[in-house]
Design a protein with these regions (language model features):
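Divalent metal-coordination and catalytic microenvironments
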Residues: 60, 67, 84
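N-terminal helix-turn-helix DNA-binding core of bacterial DNA-binding proteins
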Residues: 15-56, 82-91
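Functional cleft and adjacent loop/helix regions within the main domain
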Residues: 60-63, 76
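Beta-hairpin "wing" of winged helix-turn-helix
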Residues: 69-78, 85
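Amphipathic alpha-helical dimerization/coiled-coil segments
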Residues: 1-16, 34-38, 88-119
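Alpha-helical residues within the helix-turn-helix
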Residues: 51, 62, 68-69
Length: 119
């Protein structure tokens, strides 16, 4: 095996990266995540997410749990409601992990990637 790949496989971040990617590798979870990213810091109650995505609340609950466990979204109780929001720090960390070894750490080789994460 090549040394670079060996380093990546031994990286303690590999498991966390895979957890984040696996959480997004399903249609309802990806749509939920994108909806929460669009809602900015305000977040959304589970019922509103369910309505927006036309997904049964009990089905959505399992997906919200997976996204929460991955760290990509956060949940906060506000009265009787659970408010879900994107964890932008975790998103930035995931994106950085994906590109940190890109182009042999030569930024000039990754011009397009320099635009990642800029809104």
């Amino acid at each position: 095996m090549k040394p670079l790949l060996e380093d990546l496989e031994r990286s303690p971040d590999l498991s966390a990266t895979l957890t984040g990617l696996n959480a997004l590798a399903q249609e309802i979870r990806l749509k939920t995540f994108r909806l929460l990213m669009a809602s900015e810091k305000d977040g959304m109650p589970a019922g509103m997410i369910s309505s927006e995505l036309d997904v049964a609340p009990n089905k959505l609950s399992a997906h919200l749990n997976i996204l929460t466990q991955s760290g990509l979204i956060e949940v906060e109780r506000q009265g009787r409601h659970m408010i879900y929001s994107a964890n932008t720090d975790a998103v930035a960390t995931l994106l950085n992990r994906l590109v940190e070894t890109c182009c042999h750490n030569d930024p000039s080789l990754c011009e397009e990637l320099s635009k990642v994460g800029k809104c």
